A protein has these predicted regions:
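Conserved catalytic core of the tyrosine transesterase superfamily
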Residues: 1-315
Length: 315
């Protein structure tokens, strides 16, 4: 197989296997997203422009072709504006890498940088009212191991405003609950790490959880804090498991609380924590990185207008 532009594919290989992994230290999810973007771009060249993979090279990364690729994602693959923008960001990142390796390719950055991003509609901020949150927390059966586990997970998620993936990734060694200043160590998007303080109530709850679910004689720092047991084998709890039990508890909670949303999902706990702090008077300038996405949605500019809040809690 003869390639028209061998340097193009070598650059893709090094970009995906070395630059994103070693230099940028991106998470596996981000690496996967960038790889998918380039795969889709090559698919577009083949299906829409009739170019075999061997015929594609740097000279084909033009303003016209990239604009056509984004239009194809919209009309043929029905991608949302935010997804289309993510694909464009990945291609721009590749163009930047290519220009670092060979400055003569800086023109790629200029061409692709001129491609307009898609306008995205503002997302509705979904959160649970205080009453709905209380009703949700009442649903797990604390006399059962899984029920107690689910309760502890939801309480910890609300207390720390952690993302679901961040909590399922937590290992016992990431907890520090015996000292004067108890904390939890979270690894977020892009492998960004942060230390989050824990409230006294959560520390007491976690100590009970550890005694019940991780007895001291067999406890190891490398063990995942939250796990499932199937046929006697422990496995890291998945985000799908969290989504399922929260959906179940949300449906049960709606029977006793009319303010419960029709659909309850993990990220609502993160938004709920941020909204409850915001309503209690926390200035946006004090929001740390844990709430950066929420703070962007509640920018000083947007507060001048009604904020889209999806909750039935009375004003």
């Amino acid at each position: 197989m003869r390639l028209k532009d061998e340097a193009f594919y070598k650059a893709i290989r090094d970009f995906l296997n070395f630059y994103l992994v070693k230099q940028k230290n991106y998470s596996p999810n981000t690496q996967r997203s960038y790889r998918e973007a380039l795969n889709l771009l090559l698919l577009y060249f083949k299906t829409e422009l009739g170019m075999e993979y061997t015929q594609v090279g740097f000279e084909d990364l033009t303003y016209s072709n990239i604009s056509g690729f984004l239009a194809w994602l919209d009309t043929e693959r029905h991608c949302s504006p935010s997804t289309i923008n993510l694909r464009l960001m990945a291609i721009r990142s590749f163009a930047k890498y290519a220009s670092i390796v060979d400055p003569s390719r800086i023109y790629l950055q200029v061409d692709i940088g001129n491609v307009d991003v898609r306008k995205c509609q503002g997302k509705v901020v979904e959160f649970l009212s205080v009453s709905a949150l209380a009703a949700l927390m009442e649903q797990p059966d604390l006399n059962k191991k899984n029920g107690f586990r689910d309760f502890c997970f939801m309480k910890l998620m609300y207390d720390t405003a952690a993302r679901c993936q961040e909590l399922v990734d937590v290992r016992i060694g990431d907890l520090s609950i015996r000292g004067v200043h108890p904390t939890i160590y979270l690894t977020g998007k892009g492998r960004k790490m942060r230390i989050v303080p824990l409230s006294a109530d959560i520390v007491d709850l976690l100590k009970r959880y550890m005694d019940a679910m991780h007895p001291a004689p067999s406890r190891k720092d490398s063990d995942f804090l939250f796990y499932t047991t199937i046929h006697g084998v422990r496995s890291k709890m998945s985000t799908d498991t969290v989504s399922l039990f929260m959906k179940k508890y949300g449906a049960a909670g709606k029977q006793i609380c009319v303010e419960m949303p029709e659909r309850v999902h993990p990220h609502q706990l993160r938004h709920s924590r941020a909204m409850h702090l915001y309503r209690s008077g926390m200035p946006l300038t004090l929001y740390d990185n844990s709430f950066n996405q929420f703070a962007e949605q509640l920018s000083v500019k947007s507060i001048k207008k009604p904020v889209p809040l999806k909750s039935k809690e009375p004003a």
